[in-house]
Amino acid sequence: MNLTAQIARHFREVHFGGNWTSVNLQDSLAGITWQQATTKVDSLNTIAALVYHINYYVSAVLKVLEGGPLDAHDKYSFDLPLIQSDEDWEKLLNKTWTDARNFANLIEQLPESKLESDFSEKKYGSYYRNLHGIIEHSHYHLGQIVLIKKIILTGK
């Protein structure tokens, strides 16, 4: 297996399962209602806000992988559209899963030599650094989602 295939696999696994941590976004979010997803626990972000935030960066990098410019700004990364129904919540989840599948597929298509190239601009570092950054970022916020879910479900 070449390096881009391994990176794509690692990205898929944090979203859909099979990683060595045995924790993934899809399973962790299964059964979460829109009400639970939007429940505020102390000063923590909501589950929905974290899902949006993870996918905000996946979506931005996906556009670069598709040949477009990088257009992401940290100040907008938590600008979650209002979620007030099952339909709103499912729409966010479906976009997250679709973007994740497309993202992984495009990583697999990258030639390995591209991993050393500057990502969008030199200041952002290499493709390798950014792709792994997206995976690390997703794992980090997945951990938060799991903990917030436990707090909500146990009522503590």
Predicted regions located by residue number:
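Acidic/histidine-rich alpha-helical segments that form the ligand environment
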Residues: 83-117, 129-134
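Short, contiguous alpha-helical
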Residues: 2-4, 8-22, 26-29, 34-79, ...
